[in-house]
Protein backbone atom coordinates (compact mmCIF):
# COMPACT_ATOMS: atom_id res chain seq x y z
CA UNK A 1 0.00 0.00 0.00
CA UNK A 2 2.73 2.56 0.80
CA UNK A 3 4.36 1.81 -2.57
CA UNK A 4 1.07 2.56 -4.32
CA UNK A 5 0.76 5.82 -2.37
CA UNK A 6 4.28 6.77 -3.37
CA UNK A 7 3.53 5.99 -7.01
CA UNK A 8 0.34 8.05 -6.85
CA UNK A 9 2.23 10.94 -5.28
CA UNK A 10 4.85 10.82 -8.06
CA UNK A 11 2.16 10.71 -10.73
CA UNK A 12 0.41 13.72 -9.22
CA UNK A 13 3.72 15.59 -8.97
CA UNK A 14 4.46 14.97 -12.66
CA UNK A 15 0.98 16.16 -13.60
CA UNK A 16 1.37 19.26 -11.44
CA UNK A 17 4.73 20.36 -12.85
CA UNK A 18 3.57 19.76 -16.44
CA UNK A 19 0.38 21.75 -15.81
CA UNK A 20 2.38 24.62 -14.30
CA UNK A 21 4.81 24.64 -17.25
CA UNK A 22 1.83 24.79 -19.63
CA UNK A 23 -0.14 27.40 -17.68
CA UNK A 24 2.68 29.81 -16.84
CA UNK A 25 4.83 31.30 -19.63
CA UNK A 26 7.47 32.57 -17.19
CA UNK A 27 9.36 31.11 -14.26
CA UNK A 28 12.48 31.47 -12.14
CA UNK A 29 14.87 28.66 -11.31
CA UNK A 30 15.72 29.45 -7.69
CA UNK A 31 18.32 28.15 -5.26
CA UNK A 32 16.93 27.24 -1.85
CA UNK A 33 20.08 26.69 0.23
CA UNK A 34 19.64 27.49 3.94
CA UNK A 35 15.90 28.18 3.50
CA UNK A 36 13.90 26.52 6.26
CA UNK A 37 10.32 25.26 6.09
CA UNK A 38 8.97 28.22 8.08
CA UNK A 39 10.63 30.75 5.77
CA UNK A 40 9.42 28.81 2.71
CA UNK A 41 5.88 28.99 4.04
CA UNK A 42 6.19 32.77 4.46
CA UNK A 43 7.48 33.08 0.89
CA UNK A 44 4.54 31.06 -0.47
CA UNK A 45 2.08 33.23 1.47
CA UNK A 46 3.61 36.49 0.23
CA UNK A 47 3.49 35.28 -3.39
CA UNK A 48 -0.06 33.93 -3.18
CA UNK A 49 -2.14 35.07 -6.15
CA UNK A 50 0.92 36.23 -8.08
CA UNK A 51 3.28 33.26 -8.25
CA UNK A 52 3.52 29.54 -7.43
CA UNK A 53 6.56 27.95 -5.78
CA UNK A 54 7.33 24.32 -6.64
CA UNK A 55 10.17 22.36 -5.05
CA UNK A 56 11.12 18.74 -5.59
CA UNK A 57 13.87 16.27 -6.35
CA UNK A 58 15.97 17.17 -9.37
CA UNK A 59 15.57 13.70 -10.89
CA UNK A 60 11.79 13.98 -10.76
CA UNK A 61 11.78 17.48 -12.23
CA UNK A 62 14.08 16.44 -15.07
CA UNK A 63 12.00 13.32 -15.77
CA UNK A 64 8.77 15.33 -15.90
CA UNK A 65 10.30 17.92 -18.25
CA UNK A 66 11.83 15.30 -20.56
CA UNK A 67 8.47 13.58 -20.81
CA UNK A 68 6.90 16.87 -21.94
CA UNK A 69 9.50 17.93 -24.55
CA UNK A 70 7.35 16.67 -27.44
CA UNK A 71 4.69 19.22 -26.60
CA UNK A 72 7.10 22.02 -25.65
CA UNK A 73 10.68 21.56 -26.97
CA UNK A 74 11.79 24.92 -25.47
CA UNK A 75 11.67 23.33 -21.99
CA UNK A 76 14.90 21.48 -22.80
CA UNK A 77 16.75 24.73 -22.01
CA UNK A 78 15.79 24.25 -18.35
CA UNK A 79 17.48 20.87 -17.93
CA UNK A 80 21.16 21.99 -17.62
CA UNK A 81 20.20 24.38 -14.81
CA UNK A 82 18.39 21.86 -12.61
CA UNK A 83 21.25 21.01 -10.28
CA UNK A 84 21.78 21.52 -6.58
CA UNK A 85 19.02 22.49 -4.19
CA UNK A 86 16.72 24.27 -6.67
CA UNK A 87 13.05 24.79 -7.38
CA UNK A 88 10.71 26.79 -9.62
CA UNK A 89 8.73 30.00 -9.12
CA UNK A 90 6.03 30.20 -11.81
CA UNK A 91 4.30 33.49 -12.59
CA UNK A 92 2.32 35.49 -15.14
CA UNK A 93 3.17 38.81 -13.48
CA UNK A 94 6.02 41.21 -14.12
CA UNK A 95 9.28 39.37 -13.45
CA UNK A 96 10.94 42.35 -11.79
CA UNK A 97 8.06 42.65 -9.32
CA UNK A 98 8.28 38.97 -8.36
CA UNK A 99 12.07 39.24 -8.07
CA UNK A 100 11.66 42.16 -5.65
CA UNK A 101 9.15 40.17 -3.58
CA UNK A 102 11.61 37.29 -3.28
CA UNK A 103 14.35 39.69 -2.18
CA UNK A 104 12.01 41.21 0.41
CA UNK A 105 11.52 37.76 1.96
CA UNK A 106 15.19 37.24 2.76
CA UNK A 107 15.87 36.88 6.48
CA UNK A 108 19.08 37.81 8.35
CA UNK A 109 21.13 34.89 9.62
CA UNK A 110 24.06 34.50 11.97
CA UNK A 111 27.39 33.20 10.69
CA UNK A 112 27.93 29.50 11.38
CA UNK A 113 31.32 27.81 11.45
CA UNK A 114 31.90 25.82 8.28
CA UNK A 115 29.30 27.69 6.20
CA UNK A 116 30.28 29.22 2.85
CA UNK A 117 29.99 33.00 2.95
CA UNK A 118 27.52 34.25 0.29
CA UNK A 119 28.84 37.80 0.68
CA UNK A 120 31.73 39.81 2.06
CA UNK A 121 31.64 40.49 5.81
CA UNK A 122 33.18 43.68 7.23
CA UNK A 123 33.27 44.48 10.93
CA UNK A 124 32.91 48.26 11.39
CA UNK A 125 35.01 50.34 13.75
CA UNK A 126 33.13 50.46 17.05
CA UNK A 127 33.26 50.12 20.79
CA UNK A 128 32.45 46.44 21.29
CA UNK A 129 31.41 46.70 24.93
CA UNK A 130 33.56 43.62 25.65
CA UNK A 131 36.00 43.52 28.53
CA UNK A 132 39.81 43.64 28.20
CA UNK A 133 40.05 39.87 28.78
CA UNK A 134 38.92 39.35 25.14
CA UNK A 135 41.86 41.32 23.68
CA UNK A 136 43.83 38.20 22.73
CA UNK A 137 40.82 36.95 20.78
CA UNK A 138 40.88 40.06 18.56
CA UNK A 139 44.66 39.88 18.20
CA UNK A 140 44.39 36.30 16.92
CA UNK A 141 42.12 37.56 14.12
CA UNK A 142 44.48 40.44 13.29
CA UNK A 143 42.06 43.14 14.44
CA UNK A 144 43.64 46.33 15.80
CA UNK A 145 42.02 47.43 19.07
CA UNK A 146 42.53 49.62 22.11
CA UNK A 147 41.05 49.72 25.57
CA UNK A 148 38.66 52.63 25.98
CA UNK A 149 36.93 53.16 29.35
CA UNK A 150 37.43 49.55 30.30
CA UNK A 151 36.08 48.07 27.03
CA UNK A 152 37.62 46.98 23.74
CA UNK A 153 37.31 49.41 20.84
CA UNK A 154 37.94 48.38 17.20
CA UNK A 155 39.95 51.20 15.62
CA UNK A 156 39.10 50.70 11.93
CA UNK A 157 36.83 48.70 9.65
CA UNK A 158 38.07 45.12 9.17
CA UNK A 159 37.25 42.79 6.28
CA UNK A 160 36.68 39.59 8.22
CA UNK A 161 35.37 37.19 5.55
CA UNK A 162 35.49 37.26 1.75
CA UNK A 163 32.74 36.01 -0.55
CA UNK A 164 33.04 32.25 -1.03
CA UNK A 165 35.29 31.72 2.00
CA UNK A 166 34.46 29.11 4.60
CA UNK A 167 33.49 30.72 7.89
CA UNK A 168 35.94 29.77 10.63
CA UNK A 169 35.01 29.07 14.23
CA UNK A 170 36.79 32.23 15.45
CA UNK A 171 35.04 34.46 12.90
CA UNK A 172 31.64 32.97 13.75
CA UNK A 173 32.24 33.41 17.49
CA UNK A 174 33.33 37.05 17.06
CA UNK A 175 30.30 37.95 14.94
CA UNK A 176 27.97 36.32 17.45
CA UNK A 177 29.65 38.20 20.33
CA UNK A 178 29.11 41.47 18.45
CA UNK A 179 25.48 40.53 17.64
CA UNK A 180 26.18 40.82 13.91
CA UNK A 181 24.07 38.69 11.54
CA UNK A 182 26.02 39.22 8.32
CA UNK A 183 24.17 36.88 6.00
CA UNK A 184 20.64 36.83 4.64
CA UNK A 185 19.02 33.72 3.25
CA UNK A 186 16.12 33.28 0.86
CA UNK A 187 15.27 31.98 -2.59
CA UNK A 188 18.09 33.06 -4.93
CA UNK A 189 17.20 33.48 -8.61
CA UNK A 190 19.68 31.52 -10.72
CA UNK A 191 18.03 31.63 -14.14
CA UNK A 192 15.01 33.27 -15.77
CA UNK A 193 12.79 31.36 -18.23
CA UNK A 194 10.56 33.65 -20.28
CA UNK A 195 8.42 32.33 -23.16
CA UNK A 196 11.04 29.85 -24.33
CA UNK A 197 14.10 32.03 -23.67
CA UNK A 198 16.43 31.51 -20.73
CA UNK A 199 18.79 34.15 -19.41
CA UNK A 200 20.67 35.43 -16.35
CA UNK A 201 18.73 37.37 -13.67
CA UNK A 202 21.06 40.36 -14.17
CA UNK A 203 19.11 41.09 -17.36
CA UNK A 204 16.16 42.19 -15.20
CA UNK A 205 18.24 45.15 -14.01
CA UNK A 206 18.58 46.54 -17.55
CA UNK A 207 16.24 49.53 -17.94
CA UNK A 208 14.90 51.17 -21.10
CA UNK A 209 17.19 54.13 -20.43
CA UNK A 210 20.22 51.82 -20.27
CA UNK A 211 19.21 50.16 -23.55
CA UNK A 212 18.75 53.57 -25.17
CA UNK A 213 22.19 54.72 -23.98
CA UNK A 214 23.91 51.55 -25.19
CA UNK A 215 22.14 51.76 -28.54
CA UNK A 216 23.34 55.33 -29.08
CA UNK A 217 26.88 54.32 -28.11
CA UNK A 218 26.72 51.53 -30.69
CA UNK A 219 25.48 53.91 -33.39
CA UNK A 220 28.30 56.34 -32.61
CA UNK A 221 30.88 53.55 -32.76
CA UNK A 222 29.51 52.28 -36.10
CA UNK A 223 29.50 55.80 -37.54
CA UNK A 224 33.08 56.41 -36.37
CA UNK A 225 34.42 53.17 -37.88
CA UNK A 226 32.54 53.69 -41.16
CA UNK A 227 33.88 57.24 -41.47
CA UNK A 228 37.43 56.02 -40.92
CA UNK A 229 37.26 53.26 -43.54
CA UNK A 230 35.04 55.18 -45.98
CA UNK A 231 32.17 52.69 -45.88
CA UNK A 232 28.77 54.42 -46.11
CA UNK A 233 26.00 53.42 -43.70
CA UNK A 234 22.84 55.08 -42.41
CA UNK A 235 24.76 56.15 -39.30
CA UNK A 236 27.75 57.59 -41.15
CA UNK A 237 26.19 59.19 -44.28
CA UNK A 238 25.03 62.44 -42.53
CA UNK A 239 28.56 62.97 -41.18
CA UNK A 240 30.07 62.14 -44.58
CA UNK A 241 27.83 64.72 -46.29
CA UNK A 242 28.74 67.43 -43.75
CA UNK A 243 32.46 66.64 -43.99
CA UNK A 244 32.24 66.65 -47.79
CA UNK A 245 30.47 70.02 -47.77
CA UNK A 246 33.17 71.47 -45.51
CA UNK A 247 35.89 70.28 -47.90
CA UNK A 248 34.12 71.71 -50.96
CA UNK A 249 33.58 75.01 -49.13
CA UNK A 250 37.26 75.17 -48.15
CA UNK A 251 38.26 74.43 -51.75
CA UNK A 252 35.92 77.15 -53.03
CA UNK A 253 37.40 79.71 -50.64
CA UNK A 254 40.94 78.92 -51.76
CA UNK A 255 40.14 78.93 -55.51
CA UNK A 256 38.03 80.83 -58.03
CA UNK A 257 35.43 78.07 -58.08
CA UNK A 258 32.20 79.21 -56.48
CA UNK A 259 28.60 78.17 -55.85
CA UNK A 260 25.65 79.95 -54.17
CA UNK A 261 26.28 78.68 -50.64
CA UNK A 262 29.96 79.65 -50.86
CA UNK A 263 29.38 83.22 -52.07
CA UNK A 264 28.23 84.50 -48.66
CA UNK A 265 31.28 82.96 -46.96
CA UNK A 266 33.59 84.56 -49.56
CA UNK A 267 31.86 87.92 -49.10
CA UNK A 268 32.30 87.72 -45.34
CA UNK A 269 35.99 86.84 -45.64
CA UNK A 270 36.50 89.68 -48.14
CA UNK A 271 34.88 92.36 -45.92
CA UNK A 272 34.01 91.27 -42.34
CA UNK A 273 33.31 94.91 -41.37
CA UNK A 274 30.25 95.00 -43.61
CA UNK A 275 28.69 92.18 -41.62
CA UNK A 276 29.73 93.84 -38.35
CA UNK A 277 27.99 97.08 -39.41
CA UNK A 278 24.89 95.22 -40.53
CA UNK A 279 24.43 93.59 -37.14
CA UNK A 280 23.64 96.80 -35.15
CA UNK A 281 21.29 97.98 -37.92
CA UNK A 282 19.37 94.74 -37.75
CA UNK A 283 19.21 95.00 -33.96
CA UNK A 284 17.97 98.60 -34.17
CA UNK A 285 15.33 97.64 -36.73
CA UNK A 286 14.04 94.97 -34.39
CA UNK A 287 14.11 97.27 -31.37
CA UNK A 288 12.35 100.23 -33.09
CA UNK A 289 8.79 98.80 -33.06
CA UNK A 290 9.20 97.89 -29.40
CA UNK A 291 10.45 101.40 -28.56
CA UNK A 292 7.54 102.96 -30.46
CA UNK A 293 5.06 100.78 -28.64
CA UNK A 294 6.38 101.84 -25.22
CA UNK A 295 5.44 105.58 -25.43
CA UNK A 296 2.04 104.64 -26.79
CA UNK A 297 1.43 102.55 -23.68
CA UNK A 298 2.60 105.42 -21.44
CA UNK A 299 0.24 107.86 -23.22
CA UNK A 300 -2.65 105.48 -22.92
CA UNK A 301 -1.93 105.11 -19.21
CA UNK A 302 -1.81 108.88 -18.66
CA UNK A 303 -5.13 109.34 -20.48
CA UNK A 304 -6.66 106.64 -18.36
CA UNK A 305 -5.46 108.32 -15.15
CA UNK A 306 -6.83 111.71 -16.28
CA UNK A 307 -10.24 110.27 -17.07
CA UNK A 308 -10.27 108.58 -13.65
CA UNK A 309 -9.50 111.90 -11.97
CA UNK A 310 -12.29 113.65 -13.89
CA UNK A 311 -14.69 110.96 -12.87
CA UNK A 312 -13.70 111.38 -9.23
CA UNK A 313 -14.16 115.20 -9.21
CA UNK A 314 -17.50 114.88 -10.96
CA UNK A 315 -18.77 112.59 -8.24
CA UNK A 316 -17.92 114.95 -5.37
CA UNK A 317 -18.94 118.31 -6.96
From Swiss-Prot:
GO MF term list: large ribosomal subunit rRNA binding; peptide binding; structural constituent of ribosome
Disulphide connectivity of cysteines: none
Region named Disordered: 294-317
CC terms in the record's Gene Ontology section: cytoplasm; cytoplasmic ribonucleoprotein granule; cytosolic large ribosomal subunit; cytosolic ribosome; dendrite; nucleus; postsynapse; postsynaptic density
Post-translational modification, as annotated: Ubiquitinated at Lys-264 by RNF14 and RNF25 in response to ribosome collisions (ribosome stalling).
Compositional bias ranges of the Acidic residues kind: 302-311
Modification Phosphotyrosine, positions: 24
Modified residues (Phosphothreonine): 59
Phosphoserine sites (modified residues): 304, 307
Keywords: Cytoplasm, Isopeptide bond, Nucleus, Phosphoprotein, Ribonucleoprotein, Ribosomal protein, Ubl conjugation
Subcellular localization, as worded in the UniProt entry: Nucleus; Cytoplasm
Cross-link Glycyl lysine isopeptide (Lys-Gly) (interchain with G-Cter in ubiquitin) residue location(s): 264
Family according to the record: Belongs to the universal ribosomal protein uL10 family.
Function statement: Ribosomal protein P0 is the functional equivalent of E.coli protein L10.
Protein name as it appears in the record: Large ribosomal subunit protein uL10
Organism: Rattus norvegicus (Rat)
Lineage: Eukaryota, Metazoa, Chordata, Craniata, Vertebrata
Amino acid sequence: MPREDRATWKSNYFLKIIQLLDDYPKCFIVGADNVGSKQMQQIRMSLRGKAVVLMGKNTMMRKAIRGHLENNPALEKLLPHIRGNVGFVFTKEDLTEIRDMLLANKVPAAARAGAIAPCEVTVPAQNTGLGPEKTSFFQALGITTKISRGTIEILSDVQLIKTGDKVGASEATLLNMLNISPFSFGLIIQQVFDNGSIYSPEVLDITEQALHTRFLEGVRNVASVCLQIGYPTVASVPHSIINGYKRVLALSVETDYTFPLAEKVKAFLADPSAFAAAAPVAAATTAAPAAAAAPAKVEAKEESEESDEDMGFGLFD
